[in-house]
A protein has these predicted regions:
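Beta-strand-rich ligand-recognition modules
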Residues: 1-39, 119-156, 221
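Short beta-strand edge segments in extracellular beta-sheet folds
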Residues: 53, 119, 184-188
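Beta-strand-rich binding/interaction modules
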Residues: 75-130, 166
Length: 415
């Protein structure tokens, strides 16, 4: 389940020599639909690409790429960390296989070249009694099986989206490359200090928009031309950030944000809306909540444009969101976590599971009424803060998290 998250299936055992037919059965609604109650038009069918992939018996299953300052607090030199993962079939053990990691700049010049031993990375002979430095008996698992310090790299920002290219080459015992994957790399560091969002040590103000995947002619199917048009409009309006409201977008969107420069708040496909916080507080739904966030983060973890995870939208708050926050922070300590529903009410502080204070539906002008408030009533919904209330929150001294308006100038009906 999860119509906006990636899915992958191993169909090897069902294939036969010659021509094969693959059939898809798509359900428009399921019990998972209770977590997809976003305010948008609902369509049936397949609206994203499907790929059939053939791989060797040892393959690069996944990899994590991170960039961190080589010295904490100094943004001159960066450390490149690569954590590869492999899948093996047919009894292979990886003996004699190597993984070559080559980083090139935008002009194709080689910056660094590293080689790792696949057998050591797989560590198939690991026994419980044997120490494993990457998955220790106590403490978190380590990152960076392959790492190098890059001297004075070009830094990635939304204004200067400089990208390097990382080539990962899996080579067999004869030195032949049997698989190669390429990953754009942007050297950047995201931090929160003293109530400010920092990119490479510099304070940044996000001037962002919410964006649905919606085309007047192709509905949910987003062409590259339409995505480029959206980014151009944002750039012309001095927009530097976008929230993937309210689900992970098609993969090509993140690639364009990497190369053209937009800060992305990547949002999980979770919105129970009319049920308020019922499901967020129900343990039966714990796995469904976590599954959607995990699949989002696993897919988008290597994009430099993704600077923040968002746990969802308008689903109340409860232990299921606390679980998502714990997983995201442990899986990826390099990005802050957002969720507009994690709000304190009646003077209570916002939960510590989020790294930013989020409010929405703020008035564009003071005289404008908030949504849902009858004219003439002097009443303020807790989640619809006035601008002066946001300023008050930002200036308080007992909570130094940045304040963000996750939605404003709300206009139902456009998507």
């Amino acid at each position: 389940q999860g119509s906006m998250e990636p899915s992958e299936f191993n169909i090897t055992r069902w294939l036969k020599p010659g021509e094969n037919q693959i059939a898809l059965e798509v359900y428009r609604y399921s019990d998972g639909s209770y977590l997809e109650d976003q305010d948008f038009w609902r369509f049936g069918g397949v609206h994203r690409s499907i790929h059939l992939v053939h791989t060797p018996d040892i393959r690069i299953r996944d990899y994590v790429v991170r960039t961190l300052p080589a010295v904490q607090g100094n943004y001159q030199d960066f450390r490149l960390l690569i954590d590869p993962q492999f899948s093996v079939y047919q009894g292979m053990d990886g003996k004699g296989y190597t993984l070559q990691a080559v980083l090139k700049d935008a002009d194709g010049r080689e910056v660094v070249n590293m080689v790792g031993n696949v057998e050591d990375i797989l560590d198939l002979e690991h026994k419980a009694a044997r120490m494993n430095e990457w998955y220790p008996q106590r403490g978190p698992r380590k990152m960076g099986r392959m790492s190098a310090v890059i001297k004075s790299p070009q830094r990635w920002t939304a204004e200067t989206p400089y990208l390097y290219k990382l080539e990962l080459r899996l080579q067999n015992v004869n030195g032949q490359t049997i698989e190669q994957v390429e990953q754009p790399v942007g050297f950047r560091c995201i931090e929160i200090k003293d109530g400010q969002m920092l990119v490479n040590g510099n304070s940044v103000r996000f001037r962002g928009v919410n964006r649905h995947e919606h085309d007047p002619y192709t509905a949910r199917v987003m062409s590259e031309e339409r995505m480029l048009q959206d980014i151009l409009l944002m750039k012309q309006a001095n927009v530097n950030a976008v929230r993937t409201s309210h689900y992970p977008n098609v993969s090509r969107w993140y690639e364009l944000c990497d190369s053209l420069g937009l800060y992305v708040m990547d949002e999980a496909d979770i919105e129970e809306h009319g049920l308020r916080g019922t499901l967020a507080s129900t343990s039966d739904w714990h796995a469904a909540f976590l599954d959607r966030a995990v699949r989002m983060a696993e897919r988008d973890k290597n994009h430099p444009s993704v600077v923040m995870w968002s746990m969802g939208n308008e689903s109340g708050y409860g232990p299921n969101f606390a679980a998502i926050s714990a997983w995201l922070h442990d899986f990826d300590p390099t990005r802050p976590v957002h969720y507009e529903g994690a709000q304190g009410v009646n003077g209570e502080p916002d939960p510590k599971t989020v790294d930013v204070i989020s409010r929405f539906y703020t008035r564009v002008k003071q005289e404008y009424l908030n949504p849902g408030i009858p004219e003439g009533e002097d009443k303020e919904r807790a989640e619809n803060a006035r601008w002066e209330r946001l300023l008050e929150i930002a200036e308080r001294t007992n909570d130094n998290r940045p304040v963000m308006t996750s939605e404003y100038a709300h206009c139902m009906g456009n998507a």
